[in-house]
């Protein structure tokens, strides 16, 4: 396996399964870099995007990449539309997909009106998170609980699309996600629904502890939407159940592989990556028994979310994000990195 890695010392670069890591192009020429990687590999390889920017680049340059890689025949502009949260909101409105009410914020007047109409808390999202510069302390999605949090967001709004969404109150068991792989006819060859048990940050963040469970409504909604869009390839969609309406709001649509894809590993060992590899290389996908009840935990973030309560989950989880008995080095690198960041943060606070 080859991969484009953001940093040479990233935990993923330590995996024994990574034959070679390649640096992201600083000039942004992803096609040239991927072509060079293909020459190193020496034969057609399945290409999977792990972030939105990668998914957009692969879809929009598919004609140039297809001689070197096995990739889904995706509608070229579709991943950009789905990853851009402003365009996604417009698409949901056009298709009648249930979603939280969304406003584009261009300045203080828009922000004040949204706070008045939506109330607090509300959800703030940067429409194109892959364009956010590193090191300025902005999260892709954040929960605005107090009015005095708004000015800091507005400091960075020039040249960027900031969205405010009405907050959908979520109780226990209200957050769900769907991961699936869709063929050239937008038929789901493999997929499943998972329930987000814990997240970081709480209420509007990544899954730190999740469980594979059947949910016909979430599964049906995701499959129906993919069919309407003519979607092909891997996707990851987030939903929140609104008990007041008994409806599932679509919160996010990631046109690429989701971080917790290994949660959905069935009795035969099939998962989303293997399903994609089999299909794109012209082989049949034979599904085993669904692993309903399987759990997945992200060690470092679940500790931040649940503290000591997370230890039981980490000990019993069927799938861990970092630790693997046959490949422990990524976990060790992650732990070192987390401790280094913690000590750095502590030193700054004491300075």
Q: For each of these PLM feature ranges, what is it?
A:
Residues 1-74, 109-112, 339-351:
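ATP-binding N-terminal substructure of ATP-dependent carboxylate-amine bond-forming enzymes
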Residues 79-163, 168, 172, 184-187, ...:
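Active-site nucleotide/adenylate-binding loops and adjacent lid/helix of ATP-dependent enzymes
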Residues 275-351:
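Peripheral (often C-terminal) accessory segments that flank ATP-dependent C-N-forming ligase machineries
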Residues 11-13, 131-134, 191, 199-203:
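Short acidic/His/Gly/Ser-rich catalytic and metal-binding motifs that mark active-site loops
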Residues 227-262:
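Conserved metal-phosphate-binding beta-hairpin within the catalytic cores
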Residues 144-203, 213-223, 240-243, 248-249:
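Phosphate-binding site of ATP-dependent enzymes
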Residues 197-209, 254-269:
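Glycine-rich phosphate/pyrophosphate-binding beta-alpha loops
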């Amino acid at each position: 396996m080859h991969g484009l890695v953001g940093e040479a010392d990233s935990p993923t670069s330590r995996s024994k399964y990574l034959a070679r890591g390649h640096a992201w192009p600083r000039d942004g020429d992803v096609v040239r870099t991927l072509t060079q990687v293909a020459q190193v590999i020496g034969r057609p390889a399945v290409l999977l995007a792990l972030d939105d920017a990668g998914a957009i680049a692969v879809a929009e340059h598919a004609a140039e990449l297809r001689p070197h890689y096995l990739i889904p025949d995706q509608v070229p502009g579709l991943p950009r539309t789905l990853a851009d949260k402003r365009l996604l909101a417009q698409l949901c409105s056009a298709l009648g997909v249930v979603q939280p009410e969304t406003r584009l914020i261009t300045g203080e007047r828009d922000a004040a009106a949204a706070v008045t109409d939506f109330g607090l808390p509300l959800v703030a999202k940067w429409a194109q998170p892959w364009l956010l510069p590193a090191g300025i302390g902005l999260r892709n999605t954040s929960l605005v609980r107090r009015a005095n949090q708004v000015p800091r967001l507005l400091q960075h709004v020039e040249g960027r699309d900031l969205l405010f969404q009405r907050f959908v109150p979520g109780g226990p068991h209200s957050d769900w996600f769907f991961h699936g792989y869709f063929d050239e006819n937008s038929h789901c060859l493999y997929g499943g629904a998972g329930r987000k048990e814990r997240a970081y940050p709480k209420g509007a963040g990544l899954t730190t502890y999740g469980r594979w469970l059947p949910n016909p409504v979430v599964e049906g909604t995701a499959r129906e939407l993919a069919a309407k869009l003519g979607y092909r390839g891997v996707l990851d969609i987030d939903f929140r159940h609104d008990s007041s309406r008994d409806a599932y709001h679509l919160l996010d649509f990631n046109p690429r592989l989701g971080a917790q894809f290994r949660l959905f590993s069935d009795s035969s060992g099939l998962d989303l990556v293997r399903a994609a590899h089999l299909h794109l290389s012209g082989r049949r996908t034979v599904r085993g028994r669904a692993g309903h009840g399987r759990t997945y935990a992200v060690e470092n973030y679940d500790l931040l979310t649940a503290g000591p309560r997370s230890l039981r989950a980490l000990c019993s989880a069927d799938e861990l994000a970092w630790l693997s008995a046959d490949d422990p080095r990524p976990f060790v690198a992650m732990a070192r990195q987390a401790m280094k960041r913690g000590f750095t943060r502590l030193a700054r606070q004491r300075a």
